[in-house]
Amino acid sequence: MQPLHFSFLFVGFLLLSLVLRLWLASRQVRHVSRHRDAVPEPFASRISLPAHQRAAAYTIARVQLGIVDQFVGAVVLLALTLLGGLQFIHETWMRWLPDQPLLQQLLVMGTALLLISLAELPVDWWRHFRLETRFGFNRMTPALFVADHLKALLVGALLGLPLLAALIALMQHTGQRWWLWAWAFWIGFNVVVLLLFPTVIAPLFNRFEPLADGPVKERILALLARCQFSAGGLFVMDGSRRSAHGNAYFTGFGKSRRIVFFDTLLARLEVDEVEAVLAHELGHFKKKHILKRLVLQGVFSLVAFALLGWLSSQIWFYQGLGIAIGPFQAQAPAGVALLLFFLALPVFLLPLRPLMAWMSRRDEFEADAFAVEHSNGHALVSALTKIYEDNGSTLTPDPLHSAFYDSHPPAPLRIGRIRQRPAETVPAAPAQP
């Protein structure tokens, strides 16, 4: 392939991605706006019209900010590639550190990633202190915002720099099959991060307290016993320091596996509703969704590293993305190849987005069915309804937008599936007082 042809292909996919995302966003805004004045029937007795309209306005605002975010990302990507930004960074560090190639490559990658983070910072700030604050969700202070970003930068450097150094060394010293060794190291690195996250990384950003004794803990322990699930601990996270949104999740595996509840979730839900939410999360584990996802990610990363192994030896790959290759060079430095690949790859993966979203929604339906079987269907409906309302989730998403992006099924469809379970399991929802 000629470098110019690859440049056109890259720009074409990028423009196609932007146009498609803009079209889907416009559909979402129009659809949500058309349905903002009537609460869907399954929720009419539980969610008020003002709350429904607030969720519609919140959804539209998020979509509009998402458009800005997409354009900022596209501009930064083009600036680093075809407009010569990465080439300039590479040449600058070559001049300053001509005799230290490994440090030079790490600094090239670190500089580019830092610039990307700085470009994303204004949108992130607006999201927290304008959009989320406008709708009453933000509880983060500017000081906490800055602290979070500095901690993320530090953790990223402590984990990322050794990872990148190891990958570069493998690329340079393990022959033509370096990509296989690099993939194996990548898998091992991710396993270590999964082990460290619950007990080392997550506590850097949030406080975790053991779940207090009481009715909630008793119901949860009984549920875990019924489902034959052992956890390394039950914890409450101070999510209210940052947001009014609520959630619950599993993290870690083996002895480090733990169950985490946001304090905002526990403050809002009744005991049986908390049990139903946890039963849903248990469903993901019991149906092996997490294991399947890890295997899928492993296969995908293997294909990605194999593709990188081939592309890194193709001069048109570098030249087509704005990196000059001298007449006596077979390829660019390993660090530049890594960075270019992981910058360009997402542009070509857009067609996989709806497939991944569909797989995730399928898993959500299975987890809901497990929750109905092992807890209480009505409590699950009630809990989900409160979560939709408290998180400002629209009840009327555009079907195509939802199919393309959403990892969870649309609210009416999800509640409808739960209510299709046996009547004795899912009693009718009580009316709103």
Model-derived segments and spans:
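Polar-ligand-bearing catalytic/cofactor-coordination segments
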Residues: 3-330, 350-433
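Loop-to-helix entry region at the N-terminal start of transmembrane alpha-helices
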Residues: 330-340
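Alpha-helical transmembrane segments of multi-pass integral membrane proteins
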Residues: 344-349
